[in-house]
Curated annotation (Swiss-Prot):
Claim: Transcription regulation is one of the keywords in the record: yes
Lineage of the species this protein comes from: Eukaryota, Metazoa, Chordata, Craniata, Vertebrata
Molecular function GO labels: DNA-binding transcription factor activity, RNA polymerase II-specific; transcription cis-regulatory region binding
Subcellular localization(s) per the UniProt record: Nucleus
Gene3D superfamilies: Winged helix-like DNA-binding domain superfamily/Winged helix DNA-binding domain
UniProt xrefs under InterPro entries: Ets_dom, ETS_fam, WH-like_DNA-bd_sf, WH_DNA-bd_sf
Protein function: Functions as a transcriptional regulator. Functions in the differentiation and the maintenance of the central serotonergic neurons. May play a role in cell growth.
Source organism per UniProt: Danio rerio (Zebrafish)
Expression sites by tissue: Expressed by serotonergic neurons in anterior and posterior raphe.
Annotated DNA-binding residue span(s): 58-138
An example Gene Ontology CC term for this record: nucleus
Name this protein carries in UniProt: Protein FEV
Length: 235
């Protein structure tokens, strides 16, 4: 059997073939669905940072992705081409469904298209030139729109599933090793202001931001324990 080399062109083609049908799942699925998958308790429930299907609390771009996620809607809207391009096969039907969802019976395609044009400046989607009723999602722009809130909610949900560990137990767990300075000690990857800037949340328990004085005490305790162990060994 003849083997074909895997080139960069092949990789690019594979990515393009996936197109929007793979990328849009980022915005309809739960980003914490697999978080703690192996160890979550029965009371743990995932967060849905988007909206539930059928909900009226939805934006137009989310609604379009919802329609595109169901192959039963291919008679009115469908993916076309690559990299997030889609076409309104029956624009009047799409507009009717959007009006039904938002309780606006007078909705039509003219109004819907004006709403879509609002997304151009937001880098959420663009009109495909030369093709009627064809649009293209900009997933980089969508990521910028969605990521801040979803990340913060996922982190907050993640930390809420853990009981705080008392500070007195840090030295017993040997979490502070010799040579680790205050600036390098952080439970979460990233600085607290970056992760908690919107809600003024504090990092979980003692691990997020332990003061320099606390760290100094713990290091001193560890040093004394090590010294006592050495003395006991020779005595």
């Amino acid at each position: 059997m003849k083997a074909y080399p895997f080139t960069s062109t092949t990789a690019t083609t594979m990515r393009q073939n996936c197109g929007g049908s793979l990328m849009f799942n980022m915005y309809l699925s739960d980003p914490t669905e697999n978080l703690l998958k192996e160890s979550k308790s029965p009371s743990w429930t995932p967060i849905n940072t988007g909206v539930q299907k059928g909900s009226g609390q939805i934006q137009l771009w989310q609604f379009l992705l919802e329609l595109l996620s169901d192959s039963a809607n291919m008679t009115c809207i469908a993916w076309e081409g690559t990299n997030g391009e889609f076409k309104l096969i029956d624009p009047d039907e799409v507009a009717r469904r959007w009006g039904e969802r938002k309780s606006k019976p007078n909705m039509n395609y003219d109004k819907l298209s004006r709403a879509l044009r609002y997304y151009y400046d937001k880098n959420i989607m663009t009109k495909v030139h030369g093709k009627r009723y064809a649009y293209k999602f900009d997933f980089n722009g969508l990521a910028q729109v969605c990521q801040p809130s979803s990340t913060e909610q996922a982190i907050y949900k993640f930390q809420s599933n853990f009981a705080p560990i008392q500070f007195s137990g840090i030295s017993k767990l040997n979490l502070v090793a010799p040579g680790v300075g205050p600036s390098g000690f952080s439970y979460w990857p990233g600085s607290p202001p970056t992760l908690y800037h919107s809600h003024n949340l504090q990092p979980p328990g003692p691990f997020g931001a332990v003061s320099a004085s606390h760290l100094s005490c713990v290091n001193n305790i560890n040093s004394l324990n090590n010294l006592n162990n050495i003395n006991n060994h020779y005595n």
